[in-house]
Amino acid sequence: MAGSAPEAVLVGLGAIPGAWLRLKVVNHFQPMVPKKHWGTFLVNVVACFALGLVLALNETCTASTGIALLMGVGFFGSLSTFSTFAVELLNELRAGQLLTALVLAVASIGVGLLACAVGYGIGTHA
């Protein structure tokens, strides 16, 4: 059943509110010039935590594949945004802000991985 129409519908139904929430969060932080990356950072960290949790629950509680597709692939997959993260890094590098780009990259990957591990840990003990 991989790639079936019902699975695509579940992913799509989850993706719509996830993408909308990402837009709202990123736009909320965008006018705050000193904190211009916080919106992207926040949605990515939240999505990492949630995907870790969904993965663990799917493994330990035999959560429905439909729930994993709806929430994991759809909602949290569209909430996170690696491409925007990459563009923000590129913009910092183009502006000569090597230290800012380095801190952003290390913090985003490190905190994202930690959030994913915490979500997974919570999910395995649920």
UniProtKB/Swiss-Prot annotation:
**Pfam family for this entry, one:** CRCB
The record's subcellular location field reads: Cell inner membrane
Its main localization is membrane
Q: GO terms for molecular function, please? A: fluoride channel activity; metal ion binding
GO CC terms: plasma membrane
| Binding-site positions, Na(+) | 77, 80
> In what way does this protein cross or attach to the membrane?
Multi-pass membrane protein
Q: Which positions make up the signal peptide?
A: none
Tell me, what controls this protein's activity?
A: Na(+) is not transported, but it plays an essential structural role and its presence is essential for fluoride channel function.
PANTHER family, alphabetized: FLUORIDE EXPORT PROTEIN 1-RELATED
Mind telling me what this protein is named? Fluoride-specific ion channel FluC 1
Give the species this sequence originates from.
Answer: Synechococcus sp. (strain CC9605)
Starting at the broadest rank, the lineage of the source organism is: Bacteria, Bacillati, Cyanobacteriota, Cyanophyceae, Synechococcales
Gene name tied to this protein: fluC1
